[in-house]
Amino acid sequence: MDSTYALHLAVATLLGASFAAASAYYMHRKTLDQLLRFARSLDRDHRRRNRHLLDADDDDDDDPPRDHDRRTTLPIPPGLPPLHTGREGKPIISPASTKRVGPLVRPTTPRSPVPTVSAFETIEDSDDDDENIAPDAKNNAVSLLTNGTIGSDPLPGKASQNGDTKPVPSTNMIRSQSATGSLHGAQHNPVAADILRKEPEHETFSRINITAVETPSPDEIEAYKVLQKCLELREKYMFREEVAPWEKEIITDPSTPKPNPNPFYYEQQTKTEHHFEMVDGVIHVYPNKDAKERIYPVADATTFFTDMHYILRVLAAGDIRTVCYKRLNLLEQKFNLHLMVNADRELLAQKAAPHRDFYNVRKVDTHVHHSACMNQKHLLRFIKSKLRKEPDEVVIFRDGTYLTLKEVFESLDLTGYDLNVDLLDVHADKSTFHRFDKFNLKYNPCGQSRLREIFLKQDNLIQGRFLAELTKEVFSDLEASKYQMAEYRISIYGRKKSEWDQMASWIVNNELYSENVVWLIQIPRIYNVYREMGTINSFQNLLDNIFLPLFEVTVDPASHPQLHVFLQQVVGLDLVDDESKPERRPTKHMPTPEQWTNVFNPAYAYYVYYCYANLYTLNKLRESKGMTTIKLRPHCGEAGDIDHLAAAFLTSHNIAHGVNLKKSPVLQYLYYLAQIGLAMSPLSNNSLFIDYHRNPFPTFFLRGLNVSLSTDDPLQIHLTKEPLVEEYSIAASLWKLSSCDLCEIARNSVYQSGFSHRLKSHWIGRNYYKRGHDGNDIHQTNVPHIRIEFRHTIWKEEMELIHLRNVDIPEEIDR
């Protein structure tokens, strides 16, 4: 009985299992058929849309249903990637291969930490894509309503040669996805050849639109008006060229400019009748000797300090600080959201730009001191080379005796074999943090000032020959890299008027010229040192020694021919020294430079005003004679009081450092609105005033401030042969900057630099002076239009907000 019951139970179980298996097979077969029909319908819709975009004639007839077995006989739609073949030349066809069209924006979790994407990350689709996409919504623009809207809008159409606007066909970033039978739905990146077929300048992207309150509160309106006045004050002081460089010289062929065959050629120019004289620390220029009214007036010191105090009162106003703090946070979050929805598109656009990547886009070292422009290993090799090849060269006069190079090292009890990088001791270490005095001592190789005088000075017994040879080697390294440029700071101290001629003679006689290099003049703010030494008697003497030779050579180039040639390569004036030194805030009624005879150093703002006022007048005079102009680009905001940044806001085109902007949301927001260039040096700051992880550079970048990376002092800071790339690489690694971020920073550095209009046209595009995506050429900058359009749109919205929608945004950048 038991055996019969067991047999019946086994038969029943077998029949039940068979029925279940048959049912499962049937349901599986039916599901596959439905999926295949849905895939074929998507495929037909996709081909139909492609035909509408690519063909001139529209075909409105629906495709008839096709059997699954006949799908391989369909004509190949235009624009599809080439057929991949196997080893024997047979096409590889996956029976389950389909192309699924997803929405433009998917609410997926980003694969890299917000706000950035790793520079080395590949693009992958999320594994948790929505499998149930409605057919009528598969290509619709996405609208995410979360305190605003996000819409997918194409970039404006291309303009034809006749000025007509041509519509640009939408090339949505559809990534090919193959169902290869993997149970986990593994997806593959697009084939490189397919990516390169895309036109990167035609990509669509998701725009961020946050609808603000229609009517701001009275407090906000008042704050906006105050900020608007601050911007107007800056515009009142700024020197702008009457004719923009792109209007003087129209570039039709942005090919590689021919190098200057004779950069030191002196062309005779006629002396003009201009007359100038120093009045209360500012040079007044008259059309002739008999004229009574000056022709290039500039705001006086009382007006400047009054306006600066107004800026300082604005910085301290609580309601304005609140408004600016909120706007800055909103700018940062907008960029984070932009990366969440557009980072993949930006990277694909970069991949679609042939030849360009971070390594071969132009990048300018916008802040580097000439005396420290080489790395420590380079300096060590050079010293050993000279000690081996020229030991008997007389190089210095000390204690009434002329010494050869060999005798100098014997007096130090050193040989060439003894020298190493550690003994050279020029690299900054922990002992230099908050010790600017110790940092300056690092300019002395082996701790010996005589070695600095021999190798790192141009006004020495050998007339700076060693430094000139070392400089040429650095120039050679830059030219070999091709894509790296530098703006070297070289010092004029103001102790005597002949310094300018000595400097120009050293440059011209040693033929120090490179297409990759321009010069800035740095003025150390050490009046108190010269006054205590008795070299000068008043601050007026310092100004006379610095500016009178410049006006003389401008009026009559024949009076200083070498200086005239040298000034053609000078693009900026810098103020340098330790900003952390305590100082008294200047008042509205300060003593004139002639009255400043005490031994105390004037405040930073005092230096800035008198350098600005004389430089403004000089530029007006030089522009009237068709000569190059010089911009004020001081060190500012590395340490010290916020007054420094307020004074620079009114007077300076760009500044170096600016880390103290993090202490003032109002001033930071004003620097953003004015797009004042910040040449920041995080590694240098890390050795002196602020740890790397606390540096505000990444925050400034997210918020849209005009920031670039620079090296400052490669001799003391960096370890490699390419210090600028080292600066970028460390920033990219620690702050997770993407390739797009790095290229945007490099593009900013070219804008901030003082290189010529012709070179900038070749480096970043011939329309670089236009705002927005019209001024961007991804084939030159490797920065996608998506990023440039986002930055411009957000900045434009902020400007319209500050001006209460009553502002005319210029189509070109500031001159």
UniProtKB/Swiss-Prot annotation:
Keywords: Hydrolase, Membrane, Metal-binding, Nucleotide metabolism, Transmembrane, Transmembrane helix, Zinc. Pathway: Purine metabolism; IMP biosynthesis via salvage pathway; IMP from AMP: step 1/1. InterPro entries: A/AMP_deam_AS, AMPD, Metal_Hydrolase. Gene3D superfamilies: 4.10.800.20, Metal-dependent hydrolases (3.20.20.140). The active site is at residue 657. Residues 105-116 have a biased composition (Low complexity). Its EC number is 3.5.4.6. Its main location: membrane. Its cofactor is Zn(2+). Binds 1 zinc ion per subunit. One of its GO terms (biological process) is AMP metabolic process. Homodimer. Belongs to the metallo-dependent hydrolases superfamily. Adenosine and AMP deaminases family. NCBIfam families: AMP_deaminase. This is Probable AMP deaminase. It comes from Oryza sativa subsp. japonica (Rice). The lineage of its organism: Eukaryota, Viridiplantae, Streptophyta, Embryophyta, Tracheophyta. The gene is AMPD.
